[in-house]
Amino acid sequence: MTIAEEKQAQRTAGRAARKALDAPQRAAANAVLCRRVLELDAYRTAHTLLLYAAFGGEADLAAVAAEAARQGKTVAYPVCGEGFSLTAAVPGADGWAMGQYGIRTPVLERSALLQPEQLDLVLVPCTAFDAGCYRVGMGKGYYDRYLPRCTRAVKIGIALELSLIHIS
């Protein structure tokens, strides 16, 4: 099996594990995950966060976003662009639309934009991960290109425990 085939198999396994959860299990797992994020020093000290809008059974950080907003933190979301680029956008009240992958996404024209080096904390969705915390994403490399530019941010991969897989 090639590396590309192996990664695709890992993505498939990660997505299947997420979809196997029923609604009460998913809600309980998301509540535990969000509570743990809110307890992190990296969260407590962050003023500017990049989260994501959950899609396809991803770990849902809506509770983290709500608490961060309540605390006066700046909450940005990724917008996928040309050349597999990401932009961090803080949406206004009417600043949301369905993005190119069917993901709820900020509308750039109605959002404040942040530079990667302005972020204090980046919570990165993981399709799967291993015991060494190596992340497997969706496969387009958006975050792989973006994260090195987040020079002052703490970067944390986010996934439910069931997304833990064996990566050889």
Specify the residue positions occupied by each region the protein language model found:
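Short beta-alpha junction loops
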Residues: 81-82, 159-163
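Conserved small/polar residues in nucleotide/adenosyl-binding loops
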Residues: 165-167
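Short beta-strand segments
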Residues: 52-54, 78, 124-125, 157-159
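Active-site beta-strand/loop microenvironment that shapes enzyme catalytic pockets
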Residues: 14, 118-157
